[in-house]
């Protein structure tokens, strides 16, 4: 977007705006003032910052037109020319040896489950040359989306960000991730998901805003995707939020977990308070009893091995092995044959792959 416009950018796959130059709105400031009496300027109403941080309509805010063009060039390098073509790849020989840089991931997760860390570190260690092109970086920062390459092949990245809202999913994050997964599915780009999610963000505003309806968009996006889906659980994977983040239950092809992964309905404190409410209430020292029960719960359930035994996780790996393991899984899926028939889903209604755009259009030749 280089000037002023209205509705049409919303039906595109990606929208790039230039700060202080681009503006989008359905009704302009003059009409709004006449109808509602509100005083608002062009920049505040529909500027690049507004649509990148608040509305989520735009995917990137460029500093100038040159920056915008460079971003678009980078973006197009990950996408095919149409939804029936292969994504552009530059195959290179896999280097599966564990390096010192890979071993840095072994110390990424803090000892305290409540201490945040930057998920960008995990993402960049897995991608070729640590190159990651983020989309909608300023909108719903509690979830990360973007593109990178694994062994020269484009992949889409979806990841919870513990640095924001502890990685909780909310309305904006759910819709942001769902649209991105659908975009990857439409253009034959595999999806690599990093999970550290304690749940959906609680709150009256979230419930009134329709978190049930809008959060379900992420379920549909993953469940209907026909591209390879690879998921890595780094730490928390609790409740319904775990299910919607590319879980095995939604048909993901390869689900990996680090030893620090915690796969459960909820965290230890919440579970103990519900399951052992009467025991704690009757105890002489409720705090000590609660702490003991929490420790038992963590030892018995808050680990990836129970999930692995039940088939919810395919392998428990060291963080330093994430790059090589996900690389093998991703590339082998890409090389599996016809790019339009990578996975079989219950949504298929004919022999052709159901190709869905982010706007939920379906094209089946």
Roles of regions detected by a PLM:
Residues 1-356:
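Ligand-binding clefts of soluble mixed alpha/beta catalytic domains
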């Amino acid at each position: 977007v280089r000037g002023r416009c209205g509705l049409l950018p919303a039906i595109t796959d990606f929208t790039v705006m230039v700060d202080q130059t681009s503006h989008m709105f359905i009704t302009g400031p003059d009409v709004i003032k006449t109808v509602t009496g509100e005083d608002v300027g062009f920049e505040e109403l529909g500027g690049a910052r507004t649509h990148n941080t608040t509305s989520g309509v735009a995917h990137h805010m460029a500093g100038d037109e040159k920056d915008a063009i460079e971003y678009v060039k980078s973006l197009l390098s990950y996408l095919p020319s149409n939804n029936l073509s292969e994504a552009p790849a530059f195959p290179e020989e896999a280097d599966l040896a564990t390096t010192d840089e890979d071993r840095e991931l072994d110390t990424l997760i803090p000892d305290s489950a409540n201490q945040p860390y930057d998920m960008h570190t995990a993402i960049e260690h897995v991608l070729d040359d640590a190159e990651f092109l983020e989309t909608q970086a300023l909108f719903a920062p509690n979830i990360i989306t973007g593109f990178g390459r694994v062994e020269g092949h484009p992949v889409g990245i979806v990841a919870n960000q513990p640095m924001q809202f502890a990685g909780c999913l909310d309305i904006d994050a759910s819709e942001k991730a769902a649209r991105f997964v659908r975009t990857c599915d439409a253009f034959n780009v595999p999806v690599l998901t990093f999970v550290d999610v304690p749940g959906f963000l609680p709150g009256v505003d979230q419930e009134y805003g329709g978190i049930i309806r809008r959060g379900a968009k992420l379920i549909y996006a993953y469940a209907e995707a026909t591209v390879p889906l690879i998921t890595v659980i780094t730490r928390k994977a609790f409740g319904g939020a775990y299910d919607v983040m590319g879980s095995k239950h939604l048909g993901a092809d390869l689900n990996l977990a680090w030893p620090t992964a915690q796969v459960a309905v909820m965290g230890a404190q919440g579970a103990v308070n519900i399951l052992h409410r009467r025991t704690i209430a009757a105890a002489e020292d409720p705090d000590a009893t609660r702490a003991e029960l929490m420790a038992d719960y963590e030892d018995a359930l808050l680990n990836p091995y129970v999930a692995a035994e039940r088939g919810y996780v395919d392998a428990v790996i060291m963080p330093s092995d994430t790059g090589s393991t996900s690389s093998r899984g991703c590339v082998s899926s890409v090389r599996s044959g016809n790019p339009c028939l990578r996975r079989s889903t219950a949504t298929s209604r004919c022999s052709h792959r159901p190709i869905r755009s982010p706007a939920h259009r379906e094209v089946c030749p």
